[in-house]
Design a protein with these regions (language model features):
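Generic structural detector for well-ordered beta-strands
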Residues: 15-19, 85, 101
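Hot-dog-fold acyl-thioester-processing enzymes
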Residues: 1-77
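Short, intrinsically disordered/low-complexity patches at protein termini
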Residues: 38-39, 50, 63, 78-79, ...
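HotDog/MaoC-like acyl-thioester-processing domains
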Residues: 1-10, 89-122
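Mid-chain, well-packed structural core segment of small domains
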Residues: 68-98
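Short, charged/polar low-complexity linear motifs in solvent-exposed/disordered segments
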Residues: 33-34, 45-47, 79-80, 97-98, ...
């Protein structure tokens, strides 16, 4: 689905829900070359502030990109930049929901607020 610029309205939103799998983490590590053991080695990860394996932060950013590129506004959209804050780690087995909402439209520039949730944790 593509929402054309002239059809966008402040408050419109779209979401994606995905459960993070071992396969997701492995493919992301292969694609990016990020083999940080905090993502792959449980014994190593237990000794970190995370106390266990976590998904790549950029994997979560990829889910945001999927909402923007596939749903709102959709195909043809250029993801021009982002300011992000990670409040909690994303873990193997977590089901995350990413919701993007149109905050403002200025000419051809659209600003979205995107929030990810795992259960009740934002």
């Amino acid at each position: 689905m593509t929402v054309y610029l002239e059809d966008l309205q402040v408050g419109m939103s779209a979401s994606l829900t995905h459960t993070v799998t071992e396969h997701d983490i492995e493919l992301f590590g292969q694609a990016t070359g990020d083999r940080n053991p905090v993502h792959f080695d449980e014994e190593f990860a237990k000794k970190t502030i995370f106390r266990g394996r976590v998904a790549h932060g950029a994997l979560l950013v990829g889910y945001v990109s999927a909402v923007i590129g596939n749903q709102l506004p959709g195909p043809g959209t250029i993801f021009g930049g982002a300011a992000m804050e990670f409040k909690a780690p994303l873990r193997l087995g977590d089901t995350v929901t990413v919701t993007c909402t149109v905050r403002s439209i200025e000419g051809r520039k659209v600003t979205l607020d995107c929030i990810s949730r795992v259960g009740e944790t934002v």
